[in-house]
């Protein structure tokens, strides 16, 4: 006990006689200037300013078709070609790990920012806040460059010389019937389970994905791009909860697919996402390209899936336009095709949730932000392209 008191006393007395008067220079508040803030994190400020400058230029010039076409040819398509080749060699989805890393980093930085604000460590809090802001601005700026530009450059329809014109119900019925026949025919040559549902090996479908655009590129040279492999997403079930069958990630130029969804539409969904790699941004055009690619691929699984995708869009349109005609065409479908349609509907019915509804609204807003005024209805616009193209082909 005496030792404890001795130590306490020595510490207390060691400070005695050294009490200092307040230094007026240290207590005087320092004036905050732009230079002092810049010195706290110069790299973050530089990244933020460059990102904001590009974003300002993008939103001012995005209606200038010549500028957007130049950026598309000089920067966007070359980047997608380079990144597509680079990351295609990786057997897993790099995109998925990038998203997980950025999500974790964002959570850590937000927690760190809150802690530093609570502790009034203003300089460190400012650095953390600027890190969050600069990284977010840079990611958005790159997104507008590597994806947004495509919405304002020449569309696939324009590059391919296709036209959209008014179609009659009779025209719609004719092409719907054509794809019903194609689906029924191709459906006889694919692997099925005892329940009659399409059961092809999904890993094998992904393995064959680099080759599916060969035929379509001969018809539409503007679709030429490196032959890259689509990637299954490890957390595919999470995509189902927000009703995503897949997505294209412009930073890595990877086509990422929901491998948990029904196999019957997986090949055509792969073709859809790979259309984005080829500079096809709009969803209706990507669906059209997916159908053409699958039908011209020479691969029975892809051909069946493409015909099924086309029938679904055309059939839904015909259902709204002429129910009796739709019912008559539907009656011509083989039982195998009907089994796949039922299995697909049953699967997605399990994910009719508020989260899925919010996801659809968010994505519709996203499409409209980038000039796709039809929003989610743009998927239905592929009906016009399919009807005109295949009607003329006959």
Residue ranges and their predicted role:
Residues 52-115:
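Membrane-embedded alpha-helical segments of integral membrane proteins
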Residues 46-62, 138-143:
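Hydrophobic alpha-helical membrane-insertion segments
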Residues 170-174, 281-325:
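Post-HExxH zinc-binding segment in Zn-dependent metallohydrolases
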Residues 114, 124-253:
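Contiguous, non-catalytic segments that form substrate-binding/exosite surfaces or channel walls
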Residues 91, 266-280, 284-287, 291-292:
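Active-site recognition of the HExxH zinc-binding catalytic motif
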Residues 34-47:
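N-terminal membrane topogenic signal
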Residues 3, 11, 18-23:
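Short, positively charged and aromatic/hydrophobic N-terminal segments
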Residues 335-394:
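Pan-zinc metallopeptidase signature
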